[in-house]
């Protein structure tokens, strides 16, 4: 039975029910592909005719989040079906099997294959997986060892390679080796691929460049450029042929076009080479023309000169380069041989290092799996292994989500385990227009190959189904997406022709609304050019850079949407939860950028200056945070105190507390020795420096002694403590953790410190040990540009504008998208490296001659450079498509240009063509997103401003009859210079002075009374606390206000200080804190006996986590009983146990205060905070445990007392992890009792 609550389209039904074939579902953005995938899985397991158990289906995704979401959705659907048919044994069975189902990431599946078949390959079953950081460190170590060995061997091939490509310190060659190694891992058999690409350079005597794969690519590329030149000449010819006075230009231009046409129609390399050599250009006839047509004459001459320059460039840089190819290859071959051998040697060195540590990396997971699933036949061809055939027999159907992101290794794996011919069982779903992970070795060609070859007819064994009905975005956005991409996405740029069949169809349901909602797509273009008439004494701060200018534009646009002026209506968005329109909130707006580095900080600053709350999801900036720099400086001087820079940094920090004057006094003692040695001399009253120390007063001497003693103590302690515990000890002992919490942005700063602590905890598990190695580990992270980004502290419901990269937005949707930085140049730096790599075309090296100190690109590098540029631009095209399709209700595009007139002229020139598609040549030579969007909009009736600003008049063929609507705005940089505060003040004063009060003041009497008697509409809201702890909620739900059922902010009761208490022993609350601390730090692998636990408690005393008196309050027997209890045994069995986990969660105020009017307080939020004592994973679900140490009476009263607290813990945990909390327990230490509060 099909889900009766969902209205599936006919194509969706086909995707759900088509049986017994390899099925490719090309699902456009927002077309419900996940829903279709889930429904197909459901139909497989609930269909009586098939009777397939859910564990017999393999469903692979590319992220853990996607796998968890899919499993959850399948589980929810099965549960709902079971509610309707509660006696169904099959549904009960499928729900029971769900936890054993194979809905997982591709890496998880590969790992499962390895663990079940490790005996088939040379792998210890106790292996572990190293993380990216440890992998990078190991690679670096392996590479340095390898280079040292090669230098010691004095290997001539290696020495020549290092001379040619190594740079000053071999770093460039090391980068090439690492890059080529990583690139080769994208091949199913990396070593074979390296050997194959090396053969390309070992030319035979019968070598003919025209027969090579490189010549074919180059011919195609040259043809595209020739068509671009022809198009330019045709356009200018069309412009001048009806202009009187330029008749003498017509014949030369026609002749040039004929010559280019002849080159375009040539099909062989030798012929095109000969024609280019013969190519010549006639001189244009000279004739005096009327001044009125001079601009057209100049334009014609300039265009022809530009085309001539391009054709000569093709001849000199490409065509004639092939003459030296044979000689070049003879010299390059030994170098490439040395390089490929060096990479294979690195492979062995790195592999051995991993084997020594009994670990594998993420690339190994796929390659070991492939090794298990493949074997060779007598001819050496790859066939499925015995293990692969077992999986092929076991899995009834294989589902691949996001198929467009598959790589070649994954493709072979899936081919090995999927059935063939009449039993074909492969279901692939994705959208090649959203393939944006080529930099991770994704191969969109795999999708395209099937997309172009599979049949749409029913009954085909290789069938294709297209889903094009978009259920996400308003029609205005869908129309704009189709309008732009029909013009710009083609086989050359985008790798797919975006035609009518690829167009999205608007199917989203948005109720009609008369207010301010939806609307035209907006394009905002800012001219970066400075105003030539600006004043010489203009404030330098007002000379804004381009990023800040654009950020101010965006800030003004956001304020216009969220905080409209009195004469404007508030912008409304449709909220599915309330099934109605509501006013837009900051959280409805997302600013997307191609890359956030350098851009996000400027946007955050400008938006904050405009009073807009904003959060930037960046992957940089962590190591530059002052709190992280301070702690790292402290660790550096604990390891080696003779380093002056970190030492001074620490002395000046709040941990040291030394002033600049103090540092000057210390340096004067002796300028030749380190600061550490100076402090040591002061502490020990050194006789050698007796006279130099006379100016050190008692205050500074005391300060020095205190700091020096602490430093010595830390240096002793770090030897005996794990690095993570030592870092936390530093935080608490110095009070630095609390200090940064009181600074501006304190929550973020504390989160950053916790992140460093967690990083240290992870480091503890890797093969490198000790403080020195940890510092080295951090330094390598910084030097390798592996900045981690600030710790994430915001939940998804925080009311802030978000800034994120387009890549991070993939798979998400937002009411309002502002695509910023559309004028930022494409990053093409990778295609300029000294050696280029390509899967099909192999290696593209520079020709280098160390003796003559010359280098230049070989013809092969030229080919690879052009091919990689095309692939990069195609990726950028798909990234733009992803950005556009994130928007649900409003799309705004912003960008800056260097010179508005020149830019608009370039756009109009690119748009000056007869076809609907923009010329490939123009698309290839575009510099940024605006260069694609601008020409398309210039041909739209709404793009009139672009055509008007353009200094040269083009008679563009407008695309009429298109449903899309655009608003184009053009600004000068001067529009965004902020008004100085004093000018604002003067304006206000002037307005006040201009007021003329009527002598009859009685007319103001009523207004005065009205204002004095005014009452605040939201008075109750002002009494509601903005933040609660979960413990406060527990008390709050026990109290009832007799008047209105609402309890507002409570009075504050201060605890009696210790010196006023009669008893100096620990209070019950303090004993509880100590027990929680022990339970947080105890090693659960060492809790089998009294002695083991007692030893751990003693260690906490030694490390100063607790005092002797606090340790005596701990009942070791109570802890033993806990770990011998049912819940304790389950916890010990779990691989993932988390303790003392802080959280923040936003809830609606009306949830706590039931009597508040819903229509007024619906958007009022309250922040809930708390710390979860413990939770652990069990069968991919969570078990929550909360300890209680206080004495309890009746169990039922305890249950009632803590029910609310545990409810919010569970709710927060599910939100925090995205996983289901299966059970919630209270453990009562006073009764050794487990209380189930699920």
From Swiss-Prot:
Q: Can you state which reaction this protein catalyses?
A: Couples ATP hydrolysis with the unwinding of duplex DNA by translocating in the 3'-5' direction; ATP + H2O = ADP + phosphate + H(+)
Its needed co-factors are:
Mg(2+)
Write the record's keywords in alphabetical order, separated by commas: ATP-binding, DNA damage, DNA repair, DNA-binding, Exonuclease, Helicase, Hydrolase, Isomerase, Nuclease, Nucleotide-binding
> Tell me, what's a Pfam family for it?
PDDEXK_1
EC number, as in UniProt: 3.1.-.-, 5.6.2.4
Q: Which PROSITE patterns does the entry mention?
A: UVRD_HELICASE_ATP_BIND, UVRD_HELICASE_CTER
Gene Ontology CC entries for this record: cytosol; DNA helicase complex
Every copy of the UvrD-like helicase ATP-binding domain together lies at 6-474
Identify the residues that the record assigns to the UvrD-like helicase C-terminal domain, covering every copy.
512-811
**Residues annotated for ATP binding in this entry:** 27-34
InterPro entries named in the record: AddA, DNA_helicase_UvrD-like_C, DNA_helicase_UvrD/REP, P-loop_NTPase, PDDEXK-like_dom_sf, PDDEXK_AddAB-type, Restrct_endonuc-II-like, UvrD-like_ATP-bd
Task: Report the superkingdom from the record.
Answer: Bacteria
Oligomer status and interactors: Heterodimer of AddA and AddB/RexB.
Q: Report the NCBIfam families cross-referenced here.
A: addA_Gpos (TIGR02785)
- State the PANTHER family in the record: ATP-DEPENDENT HELICASE_NUCLEASE SUBUNIT A, UVRD / RECB / PCRA DNA HELICASE FAMILY MEMBER
What biological function has been recorded for the protein in this entry? Answer: The heterodimer acts as both an ATP-dependent DNA helicase and an ATP-dependent, dual-direction single-stranded exonuclease. Recognizes the chi site generating a DNA molecule suitable for the initiation of homologous recombination. The AddA nuclease domain is required for chi fragment generation; this subunit has the helicase and 3' -> 5' nuclease activities.
User: How is this protein named in the record?
Assistant: ATP-dependent helicase/nuclease subunit A
Task: Give the originating organism.
Answer: Clostridium kluyveri (strain NBRC 12016)
- Lineage, highest ranks first: Bacteria, Bacillati, Bacillota, Clostridia, Eubacteriales
